[in-house]
Design a protein with these regions (language model features):
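Short amphipathic helix-loop junctions that connect adjacent transmembrane helices
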Residues: 33-47, 229-245
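Interfacial helix-cap and linker-helix signal at transmembrane-aqueous boundaries
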Residues: 38-39, 70-71, 157-162, 235-236, ...
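Helix-breaking motifs and short loop linkers at transmembrane-helix boundaries and internal kinks
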Residues: 43, 75, 96-101, 240, ...
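Conserved MFS/SLC helix-loop-helix module at the cytosolic interface between two early adjacent transmembrane helices
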Residues: 62-101
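Helix-to-loop junctions at the C-terminal end of transmembrane segments
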Residues: 63-76, 260-272, 356-357
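Structural signature of the two symmetry-related core transmembrane helices
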Residues: 78-92, 275-290
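Cytoplasmic helix-loop-helix junction between adjacent transmembrane helices
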Residues: 107-142
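Helix-loop-helix hairpin linking two adjacent transmembrane segments in secondary transporters
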Residues: 139-188
Length: 385
């Protein structure tokens, strides 16, 4: 594993695209830590917050089919650079908006920028893997988690110092904006071939093994959505942690997610995809029980970290498996998997918002335990390619 990571960090193009992943995670980690600020600013109840949080994934879902058109028109490299720059500015807008409606609109815009950058940077990774014979996808996704951890931890520290939220987000956004153009030359050196053939890359209704994989993906992505948007609220309102630690629940989650992704390439050949998924579901279930039954700062960070480790290998395994299903049009499995993954990530926060409003956040967030058991059971039965 160490040799694989050394090769990644000493290869300029891998390292440059890795910084794009880190930056996206860094911005996202900062945002999720400031969600309690948004809730307090507009005096929202949990159900209202859940609806507001639909805005960003709605923007991503809307933009997803157009992202490919943008990349085909302007190229993956320019789309990555300008997408990263636009995303940096967009992430500062929700906290800066004076009204709930402008906040919702700015979250939609942020989601659109995120979707475009996400497709572009993953296309860059695929190009590096194809033309330079390097396996960097799992590590690159791990870099996103590292960025999320650092962003959440830094934001928590700044909150503890009573730094105004607007100053915080604009300073971070400016840093990422400048970084986008600092790595421009290296990103532009990635080999890019013209490819406008999108045959087979359209959504199909899942059946057979793909249906089972989609069900597992829904469980995992609902869990990820819950952790992204509600972990800081849980730490503040239920655990009642010191303000310095508001983002540390998500930071712990992101840290062990990154660790899981960094070691995932060695775990899957040794234990098999199905066993890794089963263990991940069980680990996520145990993790949320630790956080719920022992609602203290350090036990909650530990529990959330276990959830991060549990979900870490889900996306790389399921996306790879969907792409390898025999007798299926090229790209069809991936397109379908991506559609349902976004839907799950979108649905999770809203579901928790309404459940929390009715039964309390502790009971609502315990839904993760059921999701973990569900995907562990399915993973033991579904064929993974």
């Amino acid at each position: 594993m160490l040799s694989h990571l050394k090769a990644y960090f000493t290869h300029p193009r891998s390292w440059a695209v890795g910084l794009v992943f880190v930056s996206m995670g860094f911005l996202f980690g900062n945002w999720v830590t400031l969600i309690p600020y948004i809730k307090a600013k507009f005096d929202l109840n949990d159900a209202q917050l859940g609806v507001l949080l639909l805005s960003m994934p709605f923007g991503s879902t809307f933009m997803n089919p157009f992202a490919t058109l943008i990349i085909n028109r302007f190229g993956m490299r320019h789309s990555t650079i300008w997408g990263m720059a636009a995303m940096a500015i967009a992430y500062a807008l929700p906290v800066s908006s004076p009204s709930i409606w402008l906040t919702s609109f700015s979250l939609v815009v942020t989601g659109m920028c995120l979707a475009t950058t996400n497709v572009a940077m993953n296309t860059c990774v695929t190009a590096i893997e194809k033309h330079e014979s390097r396996n960097i996808m799992s590590t690159s996704h791990g870099m996103f988690s590292v960025g999320g951890m650092v962003g959440a931890a830094l934001s928590s520290f700044l909150i503890g110092l009573k730094t105004p939220a607007i100053i915080q987000v604009w300073a971070i956004s400016l840093f990422v904006f400048v970084l986008a153009f600092a790595i421009q030359k290296t990103i532009l050196s990635i080999y890019e071939e013209k490819n406008t053939d999108n045959n087979g890359s359209k959504f199909i209704w899942p059946t057979g093994p793909l249906l089972g994989m989609v069900a597992i993906s829904l469980c995992i992505n609902i869990t990820e959505g819950i952790m992204a948007d509600w972990s800081a609220i849980y730490v503040r309102d239920i655990v009642k942690a010191n303000s310095f630690f508001i983002g540390w629940g998500f930071a712990g989650y992101a840290l062990l997610m990154a660790t899981g992704r960094f070691v995932g390439d060695s775990l899957v050949p040794r234990f098999g995809s199905s066993r890794v998924l089963v263990f991940g579901g069980i680990l996520a279930t145990v993790g949320i029980l630790v956080a719920v039954l022992l609602p203290y700062t350090y036990t909650t960070i530990l529990g959330f970290g276990m959830i991060g480790a549990g979900v870490s290998c889900g996306a790389p395994i399921l996306y790879g498996s969907a792409a390898r299903i025999p007798n299926m049009a090229k790209g069809a499995g991936l397109a379908t998997m991506n559609t349902f993954s976004i839907a799950g990530f979108l649905a999770g926060p809203a579901i928790i918002g309404f459940l929390s409003n009715a039964f309390g956040l502790t009971i609502a967030i315990s839904l993760i335990a059921l999701l973990g058991l569900c995907w562990a059971t399915l993973a033991a039965k579904v064929k993974i390619y």
